[in-house]
Amino acid sequence: MAGSRRRQWRAAATCVLAGSLVALVSACGVVTTKEDRRAAEELADKHFPGQIKAIGARTLFPGTGGSEVTFAVADDRDAVVRLRINAEKGTCDGKECAGVLKEAVARGRAEADAYRILRDAFDACGYEVIALGSPGAAPYVVAELTNATVQRELAGIGGCVQRWVAASGADSPLAKAKASYVNVVSPAVAEKRNRGKESWPTMMRLTRGNLIASLTKHTHHAASYDIVDGQVDTAGRARVIRPFKESQAFGKTVQDAVREELRATYPNVVMTTYQWVWRLEPGRVDRQTGYLLFCPEPDERGRCVNSDDAVLVTADEHGNPVGQIRIVHDVREGTGALRLPPY
C-alpha cells in the first residue's frame, strides 16, 4: 500500500512539473471524488434536469476506482439515488452511465414507495420504524420487552406485519415469503441512536451504517413471523441478538456449565464453540433456549469436529442453565449440514 502511494505521488509530481492541474487530472489519470461528483452532477443535469440534486459523495474501496454519489429527489422527500461513477473511465458500475443513472433513479423511487408501505403499516398499529439497514432488510422498531409485555408486544408487531403483507400486494416478494423478520430495540437504545440530519432523504437516514451500528452495539431482539399464503402467524417468536463480547461471555458461561453436567455421562466430553439461535421462551425475556454441540470423545488432536451430538438447553440471560438439559444424537448428515430438531 505504501509503495502504491509513493508511485501515485511520483506520477502526480511528474504531471505537475509537466504542466497544469488539467494534466494532473486527465493526462495522469488521478481523478478525485470531487471530479467524480462533478461528472455525476453533469450527467444528472443532462438526463434529469431539476429532478435530482447531488448531496454527498464518498470514495469507493481503494482499488475499485470511482466514487458513490448520492442524490436527493426533488419531488420525493423519502427517496435517495446512489450512483457509482468512475469519471476517469467514463463508466458507472462498469457500464454506460446514462442507463445506469436511469435505473438508479427508478430504484430509488421504488425503494421509497416500498418504505412508505412499510411505514404506514407500522404507524397504523403504533410502532415507529426507526431504521432499515439495507433496503429490503428487516426493519427496526421500538418496544420494551419484559416478561409482562413480551407476548403482547410481539403480537402487536405481528399485526403490523400482517398489515404490511396485505398492503404490499399478493404478488409481492413479501407476501410470497415464508417468514418476515422485525428487529426490536428498547426505548433507551432508540433514544441514543445516531439519527443523522433531518435534511437528508428518509431512505438515506434510515439505511446508514452508523445508525445500524448505534443500535446493534446493544443487546436487542429479532422477531420472526411465519407467513402462509399471505397470512401471518402474528404470535411470532423472538431471539436474542447480542454484541460480540456479550455473546462470547454468554456462550462461555453456558458451555462451561453444560460441559460439567455432561461429564457425568461422558467423562472426556469436548464442547464446540458453536451456538445455535437462542430463542426466548414464550412469555419470558429472561429464559432462552438453544442448542450446543459436543463430542463424547475428542479426536486424535483433542478437538471436537463435525459433531453429531447436541444438547438443548434453556438458560437465563447470563447463560446459566435452568432446568434439565436434553441430549439429541444424529444431528448431522454425514460430515455436512446440521439437522437440529425444531424447538
Task: Please state what every model-predicted region is.
Residues 78-104, 298-337:
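A short, surface-exposed beta-strand/turn
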Residues 28-56, 106-122, 240-275:
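Short, non-transmembrane alpha-helical segments in secretory-pathway proteins
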Residues 85-190:
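Long, acidic/polar, low-complexity amphipathic helices and coiled-coil-like
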Residues 141-255:
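Extracytoplasmic/periplasmic C-terminal soluble domains
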Residues 218-310:
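Intrinsically disordered, low-complexity segments enriched in Gly and acidic/Ser/Thr residues
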Residues 1-29:
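Secretory targeting and sorting signals
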Residues 50-85, 278-308:
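Exposed beta-strand-loop-beta-strand "reactive/processing" segments of non-cytosolic proteins
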Residues 39-44, 48, 151-174, 262, ...:
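Short, non-transmembrane amphipathic alpha-helical segments
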